[in-house]
Amino acid sequence: SAQRRAIAEIIADFGKTHPMARLLEGDVGSGKTLVAAATSYAVVNSRPPNRASGTLQVAYMAPTEILAQQHFESFIQYFKHLPINIALMTGSGCKKFPSKVNKGGATDISRAQLLKWVANGEIAMLVGTHALIQKSVQFKHLALVVIDEQHRFGTAQRRALAKKEVRLPHLLSMTATPIPRTLALTIYGDLDLTLLDEMPPG
């Protein structure tokens, strides 16, 4: 399927000597979030370079709080049976899953607490809005940046997220809309292109 092919291309990029910069393009409902979740899972199951333990981290940036909340909830559904800490950070507040007080659900946490957990590597997947690129957000081992609807974010915002790590993280941008700037980026070699050209079954 197109989704399996996309996942395989992205995971192959992870094995290269230079960081991935890939654009995933597909209509609404074509499975972009599933591809992002599967590749995020591959990342957090890898160890940081030259370390015996620890978790690599993923930052998933959405253009609106509503979309960020939806992606956070999708990730909870995908990973609820696995020992993966997922958090949400937006201008309205912060949440963490799993929760000690809300079995099976997420719990509200303070921004200060979340920043601490992101900095010490306890949070493996951080979903949010442009709040993720504020200077106060420091990752321990940021390995993959996923940007949803990438044409809504400027190049400066992409670079701001990438600069949070000494090693440049992999970049997966996603869009439902083929637009001239996106195509120009691909033509000029800034981003490799993967097309989700078929809908998932069902």
Residue positions per predicted region:
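Conserved SF1/SF2 helicase motif Ia
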Residues: 21, 35-72, 80-84
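Conserved glycine(s) of the Walker
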Residues: 31
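Conserved motor-coupling elements within RecA-like helicase/translocase cores
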Residues: 92-126, 134-140
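Walker B catalytic acidic pair
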Residues: 26, 129-130, 148-149
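P-loop (Walker A) phosphate-binding loop of NTP-binding proteins
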Residues: 27, 63, 176
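Post-DEXD/H (motif II) to motif III coupling segment of the RecA-like Helicase ATP-binding lobe
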Residues: 69-70, 139-144, 149-202
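Conserved pre-motif I regulatory segment
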Residues: 1-25
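Conserved helix-turn-beta segment of the N-terminal RecA-like "Helicase ATP-binding" lobe
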Residues: 66-109
